[in-house]
């Protein structure tokens, strides 16, 4: 009740009462639908990935500019609670200078037998979850990406990637790992962040985790080599407990409706978009280089 169904795209685009169109169709259709909508004077929200590659999205950006409308992508996972916690830890320097971030999602059921298993439709886990995790990292780390290396696996079928490992190096020296798996029967941590004065970990979606913080950096090396569980070792011997503090993860503000609250503010008051097209383009450029890296079996240098 209250919803209108249209028989064709043309009929929808001809409706003068519609000012914004949400495109939530298979990935390979986004560009054509978006450009048609923008040429009809409609603002466009695209489900992720916004396009099949950066070139397609650049065409969409040009259409938005030519027709005086806005274009954005539904990168709503910027408001996920786990991400907001890790972003707060990073922003507030709770671990000192961060040198490593690992972000992953893992399951054990493979990819469902839908269009997401078809290459022609833009299936695969890099397009499905990878674009979310890449967007989160780029929104967190204020530094250009200078290298990309990707490994894909095809475990449950051979058409699209169902397991992904993507390594990014940032200009500030920080490294990041994005990992998506669909054949994992023991899960690794959702988030792992290592800094010079502490480490933070979120185990799973239930937000269980902790921070281990350094409170005394004065390492007192023993006169004799300690005998550890891995054998005699000075380097791998555990720190004394009085030099470390285990603390709970901080709270973080989460507004699940913020994406659409922002869009209303853009429409009513001309506010800036929360998910800017330039940010989406940057993520798509990383996706493109991931495919190149896997094909060439090589690290790809860049400045994105």
Residue ranges and their predicted role:
Residues 179-187:
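Glycine-rich phosphate/pyrophosphate-binding beta-alpha loops
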Residues 77-157, 297:
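Predominantly a Rossmann-like dinucleotide-binding segment in NAD(P)-dependent oxidoreductases
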Residues 58-76, 96-103:
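Rossmann-fold dehydrogenase core element
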Residues 20-22, 58, 171, 247-248, ...:
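C-terminal helix-rich "cap/oligomerization" subdomain common to oxidoreductases
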Residues 7, 46, 71-73, 102, ...:
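Hydrophobic residues in well-ordered beta-strands that form the structural core
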Residues 197-275:
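C-terminal glycine/acidic-rich active-site capping loop/insertion
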Residues 3-63:
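Beta-loop-alpha module in the N-terminal Rossmann-like domain of NAD(P)-dependent dehydrogenases
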């Amino acid at each position: 009740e209250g919803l209108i169904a249209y028989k064709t795209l043309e009929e929808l685009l001809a409706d003068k009462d519609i000012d914004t169109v949400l495109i939530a169709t298979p990935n390979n259709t986004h560009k054509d639908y978006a450009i048609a909508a923008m040429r009809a004077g409609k603002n466009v929200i695209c489900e992720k990935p916004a396009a099949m590659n950066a070139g397609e999205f650049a065409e969409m950006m040009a259409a938005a500019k030519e027709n005086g409308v806005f274009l954005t992508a539904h990168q709503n996972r910027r408001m996920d609670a786990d991400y907001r916690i890790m972003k707060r830890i990073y922003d507030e320097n709770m671990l000192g200078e961060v040198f490593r971030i690992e972000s992953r999602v893992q399951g054990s059921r493979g990819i469902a037998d839908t269009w997401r298993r078809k290459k022609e439709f833009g299936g695969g886990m890099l397009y499905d979850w990878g674009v979310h995790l890449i967007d989160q990292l780029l929104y967190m780390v204020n530094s250009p990406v200078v290298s990309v290396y990707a490994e894909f696996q095809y475990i449950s079928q051979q058409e699209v990637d169902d397991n992904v490992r993507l390594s990014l190096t940032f200009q500030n020296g920080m490294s990041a790992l994005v990992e998506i798996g669909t054949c994992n029967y023991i899960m690794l941590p959702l988030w792992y962040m290592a800094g010079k004065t502490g480490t933070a970990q979120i185990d799973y979606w239930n937000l269980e985790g902790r921070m281990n913080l350094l409170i005394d950096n004065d390492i007192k090396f023993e006169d004799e080599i300690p005998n550890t569980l891995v054998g005699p070792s000075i380097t791998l011997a555990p720190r004394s407990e009085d030099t470390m503090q285990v603390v709970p993860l901080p709270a973080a503000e989460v507004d699940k409706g913020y994406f659409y609250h922002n869009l209303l503010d853009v429409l009513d008051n001309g506010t800036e978009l929360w998910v800017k097209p330039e940010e989406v383009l940057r993520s798509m450029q990383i996706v493109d280089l991931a495919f190149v890296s896997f094909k060439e079996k090589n690290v790809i240098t860049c400045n994105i």
